[in-house]
A protein has these predicted regions:
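Terminal alpha-helical anchor/extension segments at protein ends
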Residues: 1-148
Length: 148
């Protein structure tokens, strides 16, 4: 059985998956996914605004809200896509430990999307957006968590 650790560094507009095969082995990039939809704003996605309503009595007006913002929906879909890849890797026994690194809101999306079996492999999480930094700088943020 391997002792590999997978480190997922993700944000709404992309993700990188690294593997560490043990102390002194460093980080190996497994994949890099660009998700450009994650950069869009609600106004870019929502052309059909919910509209307004009027009080049945009086002169009040209220905006109607949609159930979920389009950007939140896209983030959830991307988190589910990443979760499927993590499940596949677990099913293939490619790793035994998992570290999640993401900005806090997207980290919540990832946790919600993970299966219970995959979530049980999480050894640490970092609630920071480190998606844009170089791998050699990333290792400085992981030294207390993974022996690289």
């Amino acid at each position: 059985m391997n002792n590999n650790t997978w480190i997922l560094v993700a944000h709404r507009s992309g993700a990188r998956l690294f593997e560490n095969r043990g102390p002194g082995k460093g980080l190996n990039l497994i994949f890099d996914i660009y998700h450009p939809e994650g950069r869009l704003k609600n106004k870019d996605l929502d052309t059909d605004k919910p509209g307004r309503s009027f009080d049945s009595r009086g002169h009040g007006r209220h905006a109607l809200s949609s159930e979920q913002e389009p950007t939140a929906h896209l983030a959830e879909q991307f988190a589910k896509q990443l979760s499927t890849m993590l499940d596949d890797g677990r099913n293939q026994q490619r790793y035994t430990k998992l570290v999640l690194v993401a900005e806090p809101r997207f980290l919540g999306n990832l946790r919600a999307a993970l299966s219970a079996t995959t979530a049980a492999l999480i050894t640490a999480t970092i609630g920071k957006d480190l998606g844009g930094i170089e791998p050699h700088l990333l290792s400085k943020h992981l030294t207390d968590i993974v022996r690289l």
